């Protein structure tokens, strides 16, 4: 039996959804005045969905790279940097246990997608390397 290198689109869809839901949970608790149609929800959801479609229908490699960048941006920028009161931020984040916990939820929700994408990109890269070497012309 051959080991498959392809990631099932249902797993990818589930982890993209989980990634977005991490942000939704954060925003519902921390920014309850926002409507579900506000850009903080709808724009990020559309970006996530659009990048998933690129991965699924257009290019696994480029879609995976773009999705990985988006998930890392959410993890580093959204879950980590934006909770620390840096002077360069245009806002002062609340320094409370609840706020920290919401950022932990937001960050942890990114990890399954990041792990899946790194695994998928590595397997595809290894698979492409095998294809390239198998097409070489033997030396005479």
Where are these regions (language model features)?
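Aromatic-anchored segments of alpha-helical transmembrane domains
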Residues: 16-26, 70-82
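Interfacial non-cytosolic loop connecting adjacent transmembrane helices
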Residues: 31-37, 75-104
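Cytosolic juxtamembrane helix and N-cap/initiation of the first transmembrane helix
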Residues: 1-18, 116, 120-123, 140
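Juxtamembrane loop-transmembrane helix junctions in multi-pass integral membrane proteins
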Residues: 3-7, 55-62, 87-101
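Hydrophobic transmembrane helix segments
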Residues: 5-44
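Loop-to-transmembrane helix junctions at the membrane interface
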Residues: 53-80
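Hydrophobic cores of alpha-helical transmembrane segments in multi-pass inner/ER membrane proteins
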Residues: 45-52, 105-119
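Short, highly charged, low-complexity non-transmembrane loops/tails of multi-pass membrane proteins
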Residues: 125-140
């Amino acid at each position: 039996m051959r080991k498959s290198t392809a990631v099932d689109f249902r797993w990818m869809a589930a982890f993209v959804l989980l990634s977005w839901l991490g942000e939704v949970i954060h925003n519902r608790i921390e920014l309850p005045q926002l409507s579900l149609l506000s850009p903080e929800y709808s724009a990020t959801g559309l970006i996530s969905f659009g990048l998933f479609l690129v991965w699924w229908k257009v290019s696994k490699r480029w879609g995976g790279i773009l999705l990985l960048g988006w998930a890392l941006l959410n993890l580093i920028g959204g879950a980590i940097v934006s909770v620390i009161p840096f002077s360069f931020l245009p806002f002062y984040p609340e320094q409370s246990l609840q706020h920290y916990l919401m950022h932990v939820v937001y960050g942890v929700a990114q990890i399954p997608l990041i792990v899946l994408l790194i695994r998928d990109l590595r397997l595809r890269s290894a698979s492409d390397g095998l294809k390239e070497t198998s097409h070489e012309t033997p030396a005479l």
